[in-house]
């Protein structure tokens, strides 16, 4: 029986991953930067320009949103440490998307490299 880690390892064999240093250029060239973490994780801090489509909704969102129909979209994905992003990249490739990349190490690697993260600011009350 396969574990989640087995599935992630298998997914990583068939996808394109970029490290944190390559990620900046990949993000600039991307049509979509997608954070596949859950909404609460996204709201605690995310990469600038990222949209949140949680892993559990990804295939449904791409199947039902006409703006996401083009299989030529240049897509960069990330999650906490790259497991969910790898599974997401594999799914999108299986759906026919041609240009999908995952950031190796996810937002944890991004933050470890001291790259900027957008965090929400709440209004101050006196």
Predicted regions and their residues:
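Rhodanese-like catalytic fold shared by cysteine-dependent sulfurtransferases
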Residues: 1-32, 39-74, 83-126
């Amino acid at each position: 029986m396969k574990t989640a880690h087995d599935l992630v390892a298998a997914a990583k064999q068939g996808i394109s991953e970029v490290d944190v240093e390559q990620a900046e250029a990949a993000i600039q060239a991307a049509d979509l930067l997608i954070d596949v973490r859950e909404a609460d994780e996204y709201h605690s801090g995310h990469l600038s320009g990222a949209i949140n489509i949680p892993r559990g909704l990804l295939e449904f969102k791409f199947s039902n949103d006409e703006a996401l129909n083009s299989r030529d979209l240049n897509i960069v994905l990330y999650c906490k440490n790259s497991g969910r992003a790898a599974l997401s990249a594999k799914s999108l490739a299986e759906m026919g998307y041609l240009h999908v990349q995952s950031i190796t190490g996810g937002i944890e690697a991004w933050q470890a490299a001291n790259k900027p993260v957008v965090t929400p600011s709440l209004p101050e009350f006196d």
